[in-house]
Amino acid sequence: MSLKVPCKFSLTSTNKSKSIQLFFKKVFTKSDGKKEGNIVSKLSFKLAKLIDGENVIGIEAKIKTKIVGYIFLTKLQYKEDYLVYWLAPVAVDNNFQKQGIGKKIIQFALKYLKKQKVDLLMTYGDPSYYTKSGFKKTNVSIIPAPYKLSQPIGWLVNKISSKRLKIKSKPKCVLPFRNKKLWWFNKSECGLICHKWNLFF
């Protein structure tokens, strides 16, 4: 289903941290249950408090005056000379899912990052959905992840610049993501690679 009402995208600010937390909690609780809703809402609150336009970037999607989506972009710091960001989490209002908002907000993010001379945008999610936004499967031997991945098939890259890749170091992620449980989980758990994220596109 395509979006009939125009959706506007813009950078968000740290003073919206509480409303951002409630937004993520509502979306994930409805789609994935209370436990996942609590995990992602706490994560989104911590990220929102750190928004500075450099290490943590927040982007919001709005229809008229209503917020319908949020994404976070956080810096992955490698020792090599590459400017790399990480995409997660992503959420679209449950009443506006499957209308292309998730894809469009990611496209907005990619255009913004290109202007900032960013080289790569990484994510850890379902390839069948993120490939719709230009992401491609990669390997941790080519682009190392911050922690060991339980689902390495979900380690995805979107090359923004034409710079040749040669990365050997393990990246340092922002503080809220320094938790190996967010990267390694059982099949019965949702984690960052939750299959229900297709609802956002």
Feature annotation, model-predicted:
Residues Q77-V84:
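A short, polar/charged loop-to-alpha-helix boundary motif
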Residues A145-C194, F200:
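C-terminal "cap" of GNAT-fold acetyltransferases
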Residues F96, G100-F108, V118:
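Conserved acetyl-CoA pyrophosphate-binding loop and the N-cap/start of the following alpha-helix
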